[in-house]
Each structure stands twice: as structure tokens, then as C-alpha cells.
Amino acid sequence: METFLQQIINGLVLGSMYALVALGYTMVYGIINLINFAHGEILMVGALVSWTVVSALADTGLPGWALMVVALLCAIVVCTLLNFAVERIAYRPLRNAPRLAPLITAMGMSLLLQTLAMIVWKPNPKPFPLLLPSVAIDLGGPVITVTQILILVLTFIILGGLLFLVNHTKLGRAMRATAENPRVAGLMGVKPDVVISATFVIGAALAAVAGLMWAANYGTVQHSMGFMPGLKAFTAAVLGGIGNLAGAMLGGVVLGLIEAIGAGYLGDLTGGVLGSHYADIFAFVALILVLTLRPSGLLGERVADRA
């Protein structure tokens, strides 16, 4: 039971990070029907920018929490500017093109960002310093670290803020109107191009936060680190219902729990043949099952394909 509860905690932390990235996927898809496969690389850039800032300020005497705040702000600025440029240069000219063209462009952009990051930051993994006290709080068997608590609290604050933004602000109404029908929204005074750019910017900010969380939780960063979390976050978005914000949140948490619990018991289930490093299999088995049994996702609705 203790092992199970520990994996629940680990799964909630992992799922929180997946949820933040999945929200970026689902927001963009909900508005322009694009799967932005370069989104995982925004997480990677956020992590590497955070590492750069923390390394540069390591000798200034700033406390760890202050370094984390500065690194987070810098990561958000860089990632939002980068994603804004990606949308403006790579995706906007293809908005009315056949769907295969933007999809291929997104894959190409993913590889381009990985390559540029490898050139700028070099291919070797870099240790991310411990910024918060390495205190493990005993919960009567399972333990949780200060960093994990911060990840959970920050994630739920961000998710609550995002739901408020989408449901109770002028920008949120414009986003929902654009998602429903960009042409009609334009006739009502909404500027679809501005709304779409804002959606990419918000998604990038969420990915930047997730990038810093990932680096702080796992203690290492490198140019290729965004691919697998990005792919799993996409799986989470599909699991919950692509285009549905609540579905992305639920999908992230569910996927994190599946992966963590699976990793904790994989060795026992296979008689020691497979170790926890094979845990990635659970995410993709979940994706296959969802696409087979419920393609619309847990909270998704069956809708007619838009022309």
C-alpha cells in the first residue's frame, strides 16, 4: 500500500506537468484544428533558458526561490516570443492550406528547434541545480518533496486562472467565438489573427512553466528533452478529448497516474524482465486504447468535421 500511495503522489506530479503542456495542444487545436507537434520543444526551450539563467546568477547570492522566479519569468518571455514567431512565420501562411501541410510543417519545426537548441546549448545533458530545500515530507509512509508540492500548487493555480480567463474574460469570449467560427467572429469585431497569436502565446507560457518544473523535478536538461514529454502531453490531450480544456487537465492527470503506477509495478508484473525505464509503454498503450474505444476522448464530444 505504501508503494501504491507513493506512486499516486508521483503520478499526480507527473500528470500536472503533462496537463500544462496538453493545454497548449488542446487550445491551439480547438481554435485552428492544428496539432502543434513543435509544442514539446517549447518546454525544452523553457527548461534550457531556466538553466542558463540559474547558472548565470548562481554566484549572486540570491536565494533559490528568487532564482526560480527570475528563471521562470525569463523562460516565459523567451518561449512566448518564440511561439509567437513560430505561429506568425510557419503556421499563419498555411492556415488555409490542406491539413497535411501545417502538420508536416509542425514536425519540421520540432526538428528545427531541437537542432538549434543543440547548436546553442550543445548536446550533452546538463545538471539542473537544486533550488529549493531537499526536504522530503513524510506522509505516513509515502513522501513528497518541497519541489513536488510547489509543482502541484502552482499547476492548480495556473489551471484555475486559465479556466477563469477562458470563461469570464473578453479574451476568453473571443477565443471561444473564434473556435466556433472565425469568419463570424471577425464580423462581430473579433480579430481572429490576434486571438490565434494570443492562444499560441498562452500555450507557450504554460509550456515554459512546465519546462522549469520538469528541470527542477528531474534535475537535468538537454536539447532532446522536449520530444517525449511533448508526445505524452499530446497523448494526454487526446485521452481527455482534444480541444477540451477540462479534458486536457483530466487526461494529463490520468496519464501521469497510469505511467507512475505502471512504472512502480512493471518489474513485478513481468517477473523482473522489464524495469521502470520501460514505463513509456503505458502512455502509448493508453493512446491506442482511447483511439480504438473512444476516439473523442474521455470528455470529448463527437462533432462534425469542419471544412
Describe these PLM feature segments.
Residues M1-V21, V49, T60-V70, A97-A101, ...:
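Membrane-interfacial amphipathic/re-entrant helices at transmembrane-helix boundaries
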Residues E2-M17, I144, L165-K170, I196-A237, ...:
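Inter-helical junctions in multi-pass inner-membrane proteins, predominant
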Residues F4-V53, A85-A101, A237-L245:
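Single transmembrane alpha-helix segments in multi-pass membrane proteins
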Residues L20, Y25, V77-C79, K232-L255, ...:
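Hydrophobic alpha-helical transmembrane segments of polytopic membrane proteins
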Residues I31-L34, A38-A85, Y265-V273:
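Membrane-embedded helix boundary and interhelical linker motif in transport proteins
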Residues G61-M109, L116, L250-L255, E259, ...:
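Alpha-helical transmembrane segments within multi-pass membrane transporters and channels
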Residues V143-V221, L245-G251:
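Helix-loop-helix "hairpin" substructures at the membrane interface of multi-pass membrane proteins
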